[in-house]
From Swiss-Prot:
This is Conotoxin Ama1251. Expressed by the venom duct. Signal peptide: none annotated. The keyword GTP-binding does not apply. It comes from the Eukaryota. Contains 2 disulfide bonds that can be either 'C1-C3, C2-C4' or 'C1-C4, C2-C3', since these disulfide connectivities have been observed for conotoxins with cysteine framework V (for examples, see AC P0DQQ7 and AC P81755). It comes from Conus amadis (Amadis cone).
Length: 11
């Protein structure tokens, strides 16, 4: 899945 925290996202 994808995670987004503040200005950075990881998929």
């Amino acid at each position: 899945d994808s995670c987004c925290i503040e200005q950075h996202c990881c998929d």
